[in-house]
Amino acid sequence: MTSPRLDVAIFSYNRGAYLKNCVDSLQRNMPGIGWTVYDDGSDEPDTVAYLQSLGERVLHMKSVGEDRHGGYYNNMQAALDGSQADYLLMLQDDLQVVRPFAQEDLSRIDQVFDQSPTTVFISPLFLKGSKRAYFQQRYQPDAGLRCYRWSADPEETGKVPQKYADIAVLHVARLRQSGWQFAGSEEGNGALADRLFGDMVQAAEPWVFYVPEEPAYRGRVLTFGAKLAVKMSGNTVKSFKDMTAQASLAFAQRDLSV
């Protein structure tokens, strides 16, 4: 049986050091996985220099107009349209792959999609400790498939993350068959996914997380808070130590009901 193909799309804008940390972590922990950077017209010199060093790994996109998200969702659509993989992992430049991603991880993704025919999104993200109560109130473990499924009150109106999140593993064929076109916001995509698909699944062994204190952009402009944070603590990437292979194995064998 042929193993499914997983590729990675990384979306970047003017955060060269963060992009390098993301790419380096991907190469360490997901060797052999194909990846492409979709850059939204970066013009910061260090970022441009790093992008040039990646050569053909980079697709230089350019957003149009004054969209507060730049060309992010257009670039996500371009990645989906151009993908030749079965599954596509969408990342941003401020994310890090924090543990080794093994063949068993890909097999679990494949099993979830195979046994959940209305599922098109799987979250690869570790959750912040501050959201522990939120998670425990809204998810139940599926021990057979090693994942968590949404089980909150059906009257909840928000569809992020019940149906969709920007950072996810996508089932390429199902999205194409539905005629999926990314909306211009995470909330808009959540509403669209609510009409078309079942709930998003949370991986029980996530492998991706946001690095802390990253500079944030709104409408291609660095936010005031981000400028203040850079001034106070510098612009050095505060990256994570990778989880060891031994720790990853113990993580994958833990009791999900605890």
Q: What is the role of each PLM region?
A:
Residues 164-173, 177-258:
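C-terminal catalytic/acceptor-binding lobe
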Residues 24-33:
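Short, acidic, metal-binding catalytic loop of nucleotide-sugar glycosyltransferases
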Residues 88:
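Short aromatic/hydrophobic "clamp" motif used to bind/position activated sugar donors
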Residues 1-24:
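N-proximal low-complexity "stem/linker" segments adjacent to membrane-targeting elements
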Residues 100-121:
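Conserved donor-nucleotide/metal-binding helix-loop-beta segment in metal-dependent transferases, i.e.
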Residues 149-170:
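A recurrent flexible, glycine/aromatic-enriched loop bordering the glycosyltransferase active site
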Residues 43-83:
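Active-site-proximal specificity loops/subdomain of glycosyltransferases
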Residues 117-136:
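Short beta-strand-to-loop element that shapes/binds the nucleotide-sugar donor at the catalytic cleft/hinge
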